[in-house]
Amino acid sequence: MQRLLILVAVCLLSGCLTAPPKEAAKPTLMPRAQSYKDLTHLPMPTGKIFVSVYNIQDETGQFKPYPASNFSTAVPQSATAMLVTALKDSRWFIPLERQGLQNLLNERKIIRAAQENGTVAINNRIPLQSLTAANIMVEGSIIGYESNVKSGGVGARYFGIGADTQYQLDQIAVNLRVVNVSTGEILSSVNTSKTILSYEVQAGVFRFIDYQRLLEGEIGYTSNEPVMLCLMSAIETGVIFLINDGIDRGLWDLQNKAERQNDILVKYRHMSVPPES
């Protein structure tokens, strides 16, 4: 009977073992949240708006906890690129290059110098036009990152055999605002946040099955929601709110007025600030 128990335990533990992957995963497009699907399925505007985005700063001052490097920030520093992508993918705006403006100006100087010297390439013989000016600017920042906002778990153990699970919620918050280039007036502003879920599931056995015979085994699984995807989702949600607010306040309009009751617009229009937990 004891040999049978040992055999069963060994089979169970061997079945729980997972071999490391033989090769790294192939490159793929970045996974996106529901907010991206909503953003790309908004109704069309009467006309696209020229917009400039300079720099979305990280104002949290948070760094990754030990044992990560003390110089690694807790949130990605690529919020500007994420916002430009969200504005373009919404099909409501035409983003103008401003983050790398100096590089663009340098390249234009090189072309003009070549045109003056008569050594310009065929594809650059046409005189350069003036850069397009934006109607509005979208400013903003990452205004908060709180770790361990909520945590918990559950587990049970009986005669040395048991399992448990634990979870932790972090939170990241973003501010976005639309600024009128002509007057400097802030036309619209919104704060959005996204929770970041991390959880762990583990099971194990620690039991003497006979005198001087110890059965010990464990298995576990950990999943951490990528902070980058959560930040991107918060920015995409903020862009949808800005578009919705601009429609309601007459800053811009829909191509088809009947689409004011579009399911996506209605969903975000009726979203309310959740109560403090």
Curated annotation (Swiss-Prot):
Chief place where the protein resides: membrane
PROSITE patterns assigned: PROKAR_LIPOPROTEIN
An example Gene Ontology CC term for this record: plasma membrane
Keywords: Cell membrane, Lipoprotein, Membrane, Palmitate, Signal
Keyword Transferase included in the entry's annotation: no
Family membership: Belongs to the CsgG family.
UniProt protein name: Curli production assembly/transport component CsgG
Provenance organism: Citrobacter koseri (strain ATCC BAA-895 / CDC 4225-83 / SGSC4696)
